[in-house]
A protein has these predicted regions:
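Bacterial N-terminal signal peptides that target proteins for export
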Residues: 1-14
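Bacterial N-terminal signal peptides
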Residues: 11-23
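Boundary at the C-terminal end of the N-terminal hydrophobic targeting segment
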Residues: 26-28
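Conserved alpha-helix/loop element of class I SAM-dependent methyltransferases that forms part
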Residues: 54-72
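Conserved class I S-adenosyl-L-methionine
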Residues: 72-83
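Conserved SAM-binding loop of SAM-dependent methyltransferases across substrates and taxa
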Residues: 84-92
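Class I S-adenosyl-L-methionine-dependent methyltransferase module
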Residues: 98-256, 365, 371, 375-388
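Alpha-helical subdomain
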Residues: 201-397
Length: 400
């Protein structure tokens, strides 16, 4: 079963206790600072009609080759939603990641993920904690295993409710020590979220409240195994190195969940001020398809203003997604059904990259901008043209 520490001999116990005493105050200071940053950057939350435990974007990894071409890495990453952010973080390797969402539930989910990352020695232990499975006897043997083998282990290993309850209790003890205020209602929500992963396993999908589920939403399994446009796996669990990139940031309190509205009056501006103080430019801002909702409710101009408050890197980008061909919005009205750029066959969603300079140029007069115009101007080509083959010169034999 997953454990949070290894057995120690009695001879080593006094030494270990001494180390813990020395480490305790330092950890407490870090935790206090983590909670302080969460509070400083947050604003009152709002409502959205979904749990968003997992992403609904089948195309979320399609931007990875273009991110590599742009040579984006380091700086600060800002993103919305649940764990698809971890895959972007694994690719970009930022110094800090700030995860903003209008739903306080998203902050709670990320606190649970943080606890799991901090105690997990590898991907196998992380997934066993998430899905309530007993961990294999020798965890270290799984560190170099293909992700497919790890998922097969989860498939053939039944969940254990006693292990799930024990793990959740220990994880909640750690969540409490982060210093972010957690009330009884939050604890109920966290247990419900964790139990959803336990009950549905790798087949868990995005769910909405009050509207029918859209066919074709990806399962968590398919999101883990997704590939980029070049056919390469790219999720944060695809390799142990990518997992460790995220885990190490989590252990250093550098993945900060924040409650806030992208078009709100406080959180985005507070994030901008905090990153300016730290001297960290934003290399990537992931907004999912939130802009569509902002156009619908007339708050996109405030979002554009908030983006201007961020210290964007000169080659930094917005990462966005959009869904469907005929359900796009132009200030509240549907746009035509013609295919848009970056749509890939068989995909429920499409991803886009847009550089900060292009976005800022396009949104100089946001009140007169349509969602369709936003999606069709100044976007980065995701598919790089193939390099021409070098022709080999034929050697002509000289007559003897």
């Amino acid at each position: 079963m997953p454990t949070f520490g290894s057995a120690v001999s009695r001879k080593l116990l006094p030494v270990l206790l001494g180390v813990l005493v020395l480490a305790g105050p330092a950890r407490a200071r870090q935790t206090t600072e983590f909670a302080h940053v969460v509070a400083r950057l947050s604003e009152p939350g709002g409502y959205f009609d979904s749990d968003n435990l997992v992403s609904n974007e089948t195309s979320y990894l399609h931007v990875l080759p273009a991110l590599r071409t742009l040579d984006l890495h380091g700086g600060a990453y800002v993103g919305v939603g649940p764990e698809q952010n971890f895959s972007y973080i694994a690719e970009l390797k930022p110094a800090i990641a700030i995860l903003i969402d209008i739903r306080r539930d998203n902050l709670l989910l990320h606190l649970l993920f943080k606890a799991m990352f901090e105690v997990s020695r590898n991907r196998m232990e992380f997934l066993c904690l998430l899905y309530g499975r007993p961990a294999p006897p020798v965890l270290a043997r799984w560190s170099d295993s293909p992700l497919e083998d790890i998922l097969t282990y989860l498939d053939i290993t039944p969940g254990d409710s006693a292990i799930q309850s024990r793990n959740h209790s220990e994880l909640m003890d750690r969540v409490t020590r982060f210093g972010v205020p957690i009330n009884d209602s939050d604890r109920v929500t966290l247990r419900r979220f964790h139990d959803e992963f336990y009950a549905q396993g790798l087949e868990i999908t995005f769910t909405s409240r009050g509207r029918p589920s859209r066919p074709g939403y990806p399962t968590e399994r398919s999101l883990y195994l997704a590939t980029d446009l070049e056919g390469h796996p790219g999720s944060y669990l695809s390799t142990e190195d990518r997992f460790r990139t995220v885990r190490d940031l989590q252990r250093r309190d550098k993945v900060v969940p924040v409650v806030g509205d992208l078009s709100g009056p406080t959180a985005m501006k507070a994030i901008g001020a905090y990153l300016k103080e730290a001297g960290l430019p934003v290399t990537a801002l992931y907004v999912s398809n939130v802009e569509m909702y902002l156009f619908r409710q007339g708050s996109f101009p405030r979002f554009a203003e908030n983006v201007r408050a961020l210290p964007g890197a000169p080659n930094g980008v917005l990462i966005r997604s959009y869904f469907g061909r005929g359900m796009l919005w132009n200030g509240g009205g549907p746009v035509g059904a013609s295919p848009l750029p970056q749509v890939q066959p068989g995909q429920l969603s499409a991803q886009q990259l847009q550089t900060f300079p292009a976005f800022l140029q396009l949104t100089q007069h946001p009140d007169s901008l349509s969602y369709f115009e936003l999606l069709t101007n100044g976007v980065v080509e995701l598919r790089q043209p193939p390099r021409p083959r070098r022709q080999r010169r034929r050697r002509v034999r000289q007559p003897a």
